[in-house]
C-alpha cells in the first residue's frame, strides 16, 4: 500500500500513467521559501510551452515598463490650419496598443473628434491616415502555422490594432449540399472579398474555418456547418485593422458635419526621413496592470503578441520580430534565468517551435515573486476553479482558489506553471509541461490535477 501511495504522490504517477507515460515532459516543483525541490523530472528539458510562453512576455513587460505604463496613440497633422481648414493630412500614429476598440468599444473615437475640433479644425483637405510604421511589415509571425493565418486567435499584429483585430463573419445556413451565404461582417469591412466554400451538411458541429494573410482583402471560408441552422457567426482576423480605424474616424468626422476631402489610407513602411508633424492629441490605453489580466487570465494572443512586438521597438525602429526575440532572451538571461537552450519564436506560444524548460519557468516565477511589481503580477494570473483558463482546474477540491498559474493548451499538450498556496502557509512554485500525449487536453488536465492533489497530500 505504501509503495502504491508513493507512486501516486510523486512524478512517477505522471511517468507511469498510460496517458502521459510516453509524453514529452518537463516537471519541477519547489518550495518557494526554502528552495527545496519537492518533485522533479527532466526539468532542464525544453518542450513547447504553448500559452505558458506568455509568462516570459508579460513578466518582461511588467518589469521593463512598469504596471502603470500606458500605450500612447497619437493624433498628428501635416500642413497648417488656416481659417478652420487643415491644409494637410491627419495621422493616427500607433504604438502597438491592443486595446483600441477591443470588444467593440469605440467611444474613444468621440473623444478624438472633440480633440480635433478643439484644435480649430472644421474641414480637412487631405485624409485620415493610419501610421503603422513603428513595426516592420511582418504582421504574421513566420513561426506560426500556415493554417492558423486568418483565424481570430492568430491575427496579424500591427502598430495600430483595432477591434481586437477580429471580425465576426455572419453566415446563413441552407439546405444540405448548398453553400452557406455570407450575410455581413461585424464590424463592416467595405472592401473584403470572401472566397466562400462553406458547405451545409447533415452534421451537428460548426466546422467552418477562416484563412488569409495580413493586408490581403481576400479571406477564404472553408469547412462545413449544420444545414438549416439559420444565421451564425464565424470569427476571423481583420486584414488591416489600422485602415479600418482610419475609416471609422473619417466616418465619425463626417457624421459630425466635418468635410474630409479624401478617403482614409495607411502607411506601413518606416521612413526615418519622414517630415515632422504637429501633435494634436494623445490617447492612452488602460494601465499595463489591467492589460496583463486580459493577457494571462483569458490567454489573449493579440495582447501578448502586441507586448512582445512593442518590447522589440526598444532596440530599434521599426520593431522586428527578431528584435523582440532577442530582447526576451537577453532580458531574462540578465535576470539569472536559464534561457541558453530556450527557443523563443513569439510572445504568445502559438509557434510550435517555441521550447522552454520547467526550470526556466520556475526561475522566472521565483524572481517575480519578490519583484516590486508582485501584486500586479499575481493579479494577472488566473485562479484555480475560479477564473479564466484555470476555471476548471481543481474546481471543488482542496486546491480550488489556491493555484495562481498560466495554462497552455494545444493538441496533445497541457501545461501549467505558477504558484500553489499550501494549507500550511507555504508557497510552492511549479511548472508541469506535458507534450505529445496520446489524448485530449482535458484528459491530460485530469491527470495533472490528480498529480497535484496527490502531491499536496504527501506534503
Which residues fall in each region the model found?
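Short active-site loop at a secondary-structure junction
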Residues: 40-60
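Conserved serine DD-peptidase/penicillin-binding transpeptidase domain
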Residues: 64-339, 457-458
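Beta-lactamase-like hydrolase cores
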Residues: 7-46, 65, 71-72, 112-120, ...
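Sec-dependent signal peptide recognition
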Residues: 1-7
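Small-residue-rich helix-loop
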Residues: 38-40, 298, 305-459
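Short Pro/Gly-enriched beta-strand edge/turn motifs at strand-loop
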Residues: 9, 13, 188-200, 397-404
